[in-house]
From Swiss-Prot:
EC number(s) from the headed UniProt entry: 3.4.23.-
Name of the protein: Plasmepsin VIII
Family to which the UniProt record says this protein belongs: Belongs to the peptidase A1 family.
PROSITE patterns xref list: ASP_PROTEASE, PEPTIDASE_A1
Coiled-coil residue windows: none
Broad class of enzyme this protein falls into: hydrolase
Primary role: During the development in the mosquito vector, plays an essential role in sporozoite egress from the oocyst and sporozoite gliding motility, which is required for the invasion of salivary glands and subsequent transmission to the host.
Domain Peptidase A1: 50-370
Entries under InterPro entries matching the protein: Aspartic_peptidase_A1, Aspartic_peptidase_AS, Pepsin-like_dom, PEPTIDASE_A1, Peptidase_aspartic_dom_sf
Record-level GO BP terms: proteolysis
UniProt keyword list: Aspartyl protease, Hydrolase, Protease, Signal, Zymogen
Amino acid sequence: MNKFFVFPLLLILNSIVLVKSLTENLRVSRYSKPGVSTIILKGGYINRQFIGEISIGNPPQSFKVLFDTGSTNLWIPSKNCYAKACYNKKKYDYNISKNYRISSSKNPVNIFFGTGKVQIAYATDDIHLGSIKVRNQEFGIANYMSDDPFSDMQFDGLFGLGISEDIKRKGLIYDNIPRNSSRKNVFSIYYPKSVDDNGAITFGGYDKKYIEPNSNIDWFVVSSRKYWTIKMTGIKINGLFLEVCSGNIEGYCDAVIDTGTSSIAGPQNDLILLTKLLNPVKSCQNKTLLKNFSFVFSDENGVEKEYELTSNDYIVNSFKVDPILKNPCNFAFMPINISSPNGYLYILGQVFLQKYYAIFEKDNMRIGLAKSI
């Protein structure tokens, strides 16, 4: 797992409130196009966390997973996990799978999530992503999961969709999906505006039905070979351009598109300034008084594109008021200073992705964004 993304996943685990159980069966969409497979995502947290179902083994065993573009490991609990956090999880039974193989080339590892920890051993087995079958895929079997934060989490395991720092690594599952003329090394994510609606993750392509009519797809070159990042040149509010990235060496910031983070995270001083400009009257009783703002990105042709968020997008009641921001509003902002080669990082999580459909192209190393339905 990328070290950098240990903390961002903690944002989604600790910054949202559990409000209901998953009452409907997770399922695969019947409307997937030939060559692609769409997995329906169901919500279990206020507007923030969406969980999908995959199967592992022969015969298949089903698991609920959180799809995370900020990490690179796929792991699920083992039948040998006796920790309290594993009690309410579906556990993988390797004894009943005909294709299970222990991975002798790797030792067990610890993966840390803030104060939490998962201990995994590596194995290979067949992974089923709806109609797509990935044979002999490497994944992690968790023999231990810490009580905090995993006891209260409704997913069984984590499905990493990040970019590996090791360019020779062949363990990433989307790299191993069988290719054909209609199935590409692409996956795309749609998050609904409300937890009551279904989201979707599509492997092998993208689905235009999740894109708002007349909305174009803008394409952005991935600016880091380690993470799903794009070039961010600034923030606009009321026509005022905040050059939050002007002090960086290259003149831009790296903005991570991260499904494993619930909020929008960024440099502390930048977010303090932004909240002051959004809400000068210090009142949140009427959200219409709050201003809109836009992230500005540089596309693959060097053209600046603006992606606007309104108060309906960035004010979320499930978020606590952040003491650092010193503002009474429930901003879905997380002040945090994380360094990168191009200065401090911004992390655009599910608050952003509920407004914009995201397409991740591995072969071309680019990300597509379009306004979602």
